[in-house]
Amino acid sequence: LITSSAASDVYKRQVFNPEVMSLADLLKVFWECHDPTQGMRQGNDIGSQYRSVIFLNSELHKDESLSSLETYQDELELNGYGPITTEISMMKNYFLAEEYHQQYLAKNPNGYCGLGGTGCSFPNN
């Protein structure tokens, strides 16, 4: 879990090994595990810190990320959802969150998590 330096926003940092999992597979999981059409919220959690965002650490991932957004947008529209509000931009400075926020749901199995997908599967091409 990380926080941005520009504000007190909290994000999930996902490090991946493309030899184990492709960026395409990671993006599929990303789109399916939350509702990217909710703007500044996820479930009952409201505010900019709950917005859907992809921070990239390499320009090499930008085109594939944008393409996946367009693909999933088409699927969402077919199922009655509005536009995706996910921001895709380069990662700037970040700082690790406080220890009590690290692995929060593992430490608090009954803790609240406002994430919920749309039920729309990412199309297989």
Feature annotation, model-predicted:
Residues 1-2:
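Generic short N-terminal amphipathic or hydrophobic helices
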Residues 5-125:
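Flexible coil/turn and secondary-structure edge motifs
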